[in-house]
Amino acid sequence: MRRVVITGLGIVSCLGNDKDTVSANLRAGRPGIRFNPSYAEMGLRSHVSGSVDLNLEELIDRKVFRFMGDAAAYAYLAMEQAIKDSGLTPEQISNPRTGLIAGSGGASTLNQMEAIDTLREKGVKRIGPYRVTRTMGSTVSACLATPFQIKGVNYSISSACATSAHCIGQAMEQIQLGKQDVVFAGGGEEEHWSQSCLFDAMGALSTQYNETPEKASRAYDAKRDGFVIAGGGGMVVVEELEHALKRGAKIYAEIVGYGATSDGYDMVAPSGEGAIRCMQQALATVDAPIDYLNTHGTSTPVGDVAEIRGVREVFGDKAPAISSTKSLSGHSLGAAGVHEAIYCLLMMEGGFIAGSANIDELDPEVADLPILRETRENAKLDTVMSNSFGFGGTNATLVLKRWQG
């Protein structure tokens, strides 16, 4: 079986818009969650979010940007970073052996809303020709593959909050099967009240910490009350090992495990059993102990406990250090999987583990496991696991191992 490594990364998030800033904020335990005035103005019960601070029109050429909503734009900027980080040449990028798998959870509800408003107020001819590419399910892969001249595989996966983790896993499998040598993998997510209101309406978002936004996302705290929605994008360069070595690439880690399962249980409530099978599937190809687990840990009362019960079942009394970076970053939905894979890579590189922030009182249901509440320095991370689960009972687990050379 061909071995697969990660040789580049790029990130746009509420924790920063480059890897160094993100790493520093993770290490310092600085959350990126703020008060969102538009949520309050529109009457949402949740007034907090993890918003990206960028002027997209200034950063992306107009001829490229006109086809994009925010999700695609965030992923585009992340891909620019990942390409630079990887050292790939234009000839290696635009090559039949180089592909792209990237998606989002919700494309662009803002553009859908604006198109409908235009239809009602001015008629169909005034909608314009660019709304389709901004709102279609494959907007992220389409809006990246064209400007970057991708010639290999080119498609999106949309699997709710597991989206970009599945994209990374699928990229690994494309390379293992010999169909590609390099695959850009990841995703993006727009953060706008037009999508956030849907989660607010179902009672999924945090509402009790509007006056203290930085404390609203609090996985494993006894008084957590829902997740904090976020936006952003991330891309990683997934590459066949020998191809990477031949060109002298920097190797962040080897992807040694990938699990993908379905609960087959409930549309929104996790079974826990599906997550167990997912982690077990990912671990089946791993020959080393897990040093750190970045949980899905969204700060919901039900979801956090269900996942931890699964962790207990999989690891027994040998559970690794555990934290949820969503306590700092919020939940970027379709971008969460790649964001958290990147967080793991940055922690592995920097020798630290970001703690689960805002745990004032640890939930008794999870108190028997080694959940870190503060940053752990001088952490030797050789093998790490990251979980991403989504509505509809979809699950993804990635295991990354330090490349020893």
Curated annotation (Swiss-Prot):
Domain Ketosynthase family 3 (KS3) intervals: 1-402
EC number, as in UniProt: 2.3.1.41
Record keyword Lipid metabolism present: yes
Domain of life: Bacteria
Gene Ontology CC terms, in alphabetical order: cytosol
UniProt-recorded Gene Ontology molecular function terms: 3-oxoacyl-[acyl-carrier-protein] synthase activity
Localisation: Cytoplasm
InterPro entries reported in the protein's UniProt record: Beta-ketoacyl_synthase (IPR000794), Ketoacyl_synth_AS (IPR018201), Ketoacyl_synth_C (IPR014031), Ketoacyl_synth_N (IPR014030), PKS_Beta-ketoAc_synthase_dom (IPR020841), Thiolase-like (IPR016039)
CDD domains: KAS_I_II
Metabolic or biological pathway: Lipid metabolism; fatty acid biosynthesis
A biological-process GO annotation: fatty acid biosynthetic process
Pfam family, one: Ketoacyl-synt_C
Record keywords: Acyltransferase, Cytoplasm, Fatty acid biosynthesis, Fatty acid metabolism, Lipid biosynthesis, Lipid metabolism, Transferase
Catalytic site: C161 (for beta-ketoacyl synthase activity), H296 (for beta-ketoacyl synthase activity), H331 (for beta-ketoacyl synthase activity)
Catalytic activity as recorded in UniProt: a fatty acyl-[ACP] + malonyl-[ACP] + H(+) = a 3-oxoacyl-[ACP] + holo-[ACP] + CO2; (3Z)-decenoyl-[ACP] + malonyl-[ACP] + H(+) = 3-oxo-(5Z)-dodecenoyl-[ACP] + holo-[ACP] + CO2
Gene3D superfamilies, sorted: 3.40.47.10
Main location: cytoplasm
Subunit structure: Homodimer.
Biological function: Involved in the type II fatty acid elongation cycle. Catalyzes the elongation of a wide range of acyl-ACP by the addition of two carbons from malonyl-ACP to an acyl acceptor. Can also use unsaturated fatty acids. Catalyzes a key reaction in unsaturated fatty acid (UFA) synthesis, the elongation of the cis-3-decenoyl-ACP produced by FabA.
Sequence similarity: Belongs to the thiolase-like superfamily. Beta-ketoacyl-ACP synthases family.
Protein name as catalogued: 3-oxoacyl-[acyl-carrier-protein] synthase 1
Organism: Pseudomonas aeruginosa (strain UCBPP-PA14)
Designated gene of the protein: fabB
